[in-house]
Regions:
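Short, conserved, GDST-rich strand-edge loop motifs in beta-rich repeat architectures
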Residues: 108-124, 252-266
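A short beta-strand motif characteristic of beta-propeller blades
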Residues: 1-5, 38-45, 81-88, 136-142, ...
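A short loop-to-beta-strand structural motif that recurs across blades of beta-propeller domains
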Residues: 30-32, 71-73, 127-130, 168-170, ...
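A short helix->beta-strand "capping" segment at the edge of beta-propeller domains
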Residues: 1-7, 36-38, 183, 273-276, ...
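Beta-rich, blade/repeat-based domains predominating
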Residues: 5-20, 46-66, 88-106, 112-114, ...
């Protein structure tokens, strides 16, 4: 395990695109692109907590969540930032994670409470997944307990959502119009609370776990196939590199949700772990080099 870069903020949403790892630095309000030598380019400055993003097909730019605007924004290849979809009619709270499949279906989820203020007392309102397109969005799955990382299988047939508060990965069939059906438990993960996820060519999923400071590879049904233990919280993971056989993990020491807005001494790190089975599906499939 090697550190690609250290000394950043709270990192999330790793994506492999055009030979570089792109990450959202939540505390700095930046999207950064990091090459294999550790050189960093700041791609966008945007204050949002959470802030996650993914890439549209065919060089269509990227789409990012904006919590303050309760919207999805689009960053075009020429650097223009515009509104992609208004999400304010779906919830009084801002969106969380986003994934875009190979057909351009844009799925965005919402934990349905004020993330920056921390979890509410008692049982929070259930979260949901919405399908967004330019100018519109509609809920396609609800009753999700803190929906977090999402991934789509390589055949564009299945969306997998990490339900952090139910300690499971939940799957849906994707219809021709992008709608979701046939909800099912894809994997129970014990007492872990899965955060960011990605998929590999064997059909297994990697998930990051904050509290247990690890990344775990599981197959459908929940069998644990591999585990990478860290010295700090793991927030998300991405299979990248030229052969997609590097597991990139974004990690930092976690001060707890109650201290998120006040913590200043972040030690955000991107770790690189070689693996045998390459990545597949989305995010990340066919994203250039």
């Amino acid at each position: 395990m090697d550190a690609l870069i250290t000394g950043l903020g709270l990192l999330e949403s790793p994506r492999w695109q055009n030979g570089r790892l792109w990450v959202a630095d939540w505390t700095a309000g930046l999207i950064r692109a990091i090459d294999p030598a550790g050189r960093v380019e700041v791609v966008l400055e945007h204050q949002s907590l959470p802030m996650c993003f993914d890439f549209l097909p065919a060089a269509g730019g990227l789409v990012l969540t904006s919590s303050s605007q309760r919207a999805l924004l689009r960053l075009s290849a020429d650097g223009t930032l515009s509104r992609y979809a208004d999400l304010s009619v779906l919830s009084p709270h801002g969106p969380n994670d986003v994934v875009i499949d190979g057909r351009g279906n844009t799925y965005v989820n919402n934990v349905n409470f004020d993330f920056a203020a921390g979890p509410p007392a008692g049982d929070p309102a259930p979260g949901f997944v919405a399908l967004a397109s330019p100018g519109s969005a509609r809920v396609v799955a609800d009753d999700l307990a803190f929906p977090n990382g999402m991934a789509v299988t390589a055949d564009n047939a299945t969306l997998i959502v990490a339900e952090s508060y139910r300690h499971r990965l939940t799957a849906f069939d994707i219809g021709a119009d992008g709608s979701l059906s046939n909800r099912r438990v894809w994997a129970e993960v014990g007492d872990h609370s899965p955060d960011g996820i990605c998929l590999d060519r064997d059909g297994a999923a990697w998930y990051a776990d904050v509290a247990d400071r690890c990344c775990v590879r599981v197959r459908e049904g929940g069998e644990v196939l591999d585990r990478v233990q860290l010295d700090r919280a793991a927030f998300a993971c991405m299979l990248g590199g030229n052969d997609r056989r590097t597991l990139f993990v974004v990690a930092a020491h976690w001060p707890g949700p109650q201290n998120l807005m006040h913590h200043t001494e972040w030690d955000g790190t991107v770790l690189a772990v070689p693996v045998l089975v390459p990545g597949a599906g989305w995010p990340g499939r066919g994203s250039g080099g």
